[in-house]
A protein has these predicted regions:
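C-terminal helix-rich "cap/oligomerization" subdomain common to oxidoreductases
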Residues: 1-7, 41, 74-77, 232, ...
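Contiguous beta-strand/loop segments that form the cofactor/metal-binding neighborhood of enzyme cores
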Residues: 188, 194-274, 300-312, 350
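Rossmann-fold dehydrogenase core element
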Residues: 113-131, 151-155
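Hydrophobic residues in well-ordered beta-strands that form the structural core
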Residues: 100-101, 125-127, 268
Length: 350
């Protein structure tokens, strides 16, 4: 989206779509950071007046038509991914700026139409990959692009957590993560890793993947994915392959990226907010950076950036196109898994 195409708007009213854990988080953050903004809610369940008041919500709606009549300046879609596009299109058509929780959708159907509509109407369309606002991940990216370890030769990305422990106050079987029709599964739920991999190393050119449901968890989606990603490589003209492993089954929560380079190795630990450097000269790991921020920090920065982008008319840090590129990779992964072959992505690019 061109910077000049975005119209400037003062954000007075925001609509939150969905009142799950992430919807509640967004409401609390907006209420704390922007108390002057009026918050409305659109949900498929009946509005409970006491519950709504407890979250500081002024208005609650049960239909898109009612929510459109509220005339919000912006909307944050925190409903299941399989419903994102059907909700987003009418709001974009009405001139409402959009922040859509990751993934932007559970497939690419309608995503290009949404991107085009937002561009035509001069709207911000932002995908909510909040890891882009992690101080440690930004520092990690900067160190790589500044040549700390020279040319990257190999990249190993891992993320996983035991699904029943993810939201301990909920029955995991009833969560979005566990249900295919809501857009669950490890590929969509842990798509942060696909996004930041492209943000750091360049776009994915091809994939080779194995996707499994191998645990005894009561889910109807994949719980494990092993990916090989051939990157366009933003560092040089050599082939760079990323191995990416994500799962719902490990009991030791993990989020890390290990890059092997010509001048050493660099390791990002997203759980600890740390970066370590292995130098061939010292033959040991050295902590270069450590900043364990509060969990809400990246979400707060994301909301600040969304509202700032609307009010300044500048393009967002994580665009609708970024969201589409992630879903395109996921669709190629699924195709590779079924066919047992390498799949190229050029035909899916924006």
């Amino acid at each position: 989206m061109s910077v000049n195409s975005v119209r400037h708007t003062c954000v007075n009213k925001i609509l939150i779509v969905g009142l799950g854990s992430i919807g509640k988080r967004h409401i609390e953050i907006i209420r704390d950071l922007f108390p002057e903004i009026t918050i409305g809610l659109l949900r498929h369940s009946k509005c409970n007046e006491d519950e709504i008041k407890s979250y500081g919500i002024k208005f609650c709606f049960s239909t898109i038509e009612e929510a459109l009549a509220y005339q919000p300046d912006a909307a944050i879609l925190a409903n299941p991914a399989s419903f994102h596009i059907d909700v987003a299109i009418p709001f974009a058509d009405a001139g409402v700026h959009l922040l859509i929780e990751k993934p932007i959708s559970n497939n690419i159907d309608g995503v290009r139409k949404l991107i085009s509509l937002c561009s035509k109407n001069g709207l911000i369309l932002m995908t909510a990959y909040n890891l882009r606002f992690s101080p440690s991940l930004n520092q990690f990216r900067d160190l790589l692009h500044q040549g700390k370890i020279g040319i990257p030769y190999a990249v190993h990305v891992e993320a996983g957590q035991y699904l029943p422990n993810w939201r301990p106050n909920l029955d995991y079987r009833q969560t979005v993560s566990a249900q295919e029709y809501l857009g669950g599964g490890v590929l969509l739920e842990l798509s942060h890793e696909i996004d930041y991999t492209q943000w750091i190393f360049g776009s994915v050119k091809w994939v080779k993947a194995t996707v499994l449901r191998q645990s005894h968890l009561e889910i109807d989606v994949e719980d494990t994915a092993h990916l090989q990603l051939g990157m366009s490589n933003g560092f040089n003209d050599k082939q760079l392959v990323v191995t990416l492993n994500i799962d719902f089954i490990r009991h030791n929560s993990t989020r890390q990226c290990h890059v092997i380079g010509e001048k050493g190795s660099l390791l990002w630990n997203g759980i600890q907010g740390s970066i370590e450097f292995f130098s061939p000269n010292s033959d040991e790991w050295e902590v270069l950076y450590s900043n364990l921020t509060e969990r809400n920090y990246t979400y707060e920065q994301e909301i600040r950036h969304f509202i700032s982008s609307i009010e300044s008319g500048s393009s967002p840090h994580v665009s609708g196109e970024d969201g589409l590129n992630v879903v395109s990779v996921i669709e190629a992964v699924k195709k590779s898994n079924v066919e047992g072959s390498l799949v190229y992505l050029e035909q899916h690019r924006v």
